[in-house]
Amino acid sequence: MENTQSSAKTPKLKLDFKDSKYATGRRKTSIAKVWLKKGSGKIYVNGKLFTEYFADETHKMQITRPFEIINQATDYDVRCSVKGGGPTGQAGAMVHGISKALVLFDENLKSTLKTEKLTTRDSRSVERKKPGRKKARRSFQFSKR
């Protein structure tokens, strides 16, 4: 019997990322591995264009923000592998990784990106639920009588 699944799979996207800079970004529970190189402004996330991967416009704008700040929106190609979390955490992790990779390309961008707080890891995460409470801080409804 032949394996029909292997022939039905779509071919893997081959991207040449030699001479690229690598950085990791984190947000909430998401981790993004980012490869950045000089190019034409294409951004790939897990093998797809970022416009296909992220449905929400705010996430798309958030990802392009580091390039808009340095006025080089079409000068770099990005390949990113993202794991964990949801779309907001993944977009935030990508921004963190892209910003760190841009600094590796040009040290002069560090102060610009740092003032916008893009190279700093956003350490906010979900607070754990406490015993005796409904959620992390919300108590159960109190009744006097």
Locations of regions flagged by a protein language model:
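Structured, basic alpha/beta domains of bacterial-type, RNA-associated proteins
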Residues: 12-26, 32-83, 88, 92-145
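N-terminal intrinsically disordered, low-complexity tails
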Residues: 1-13
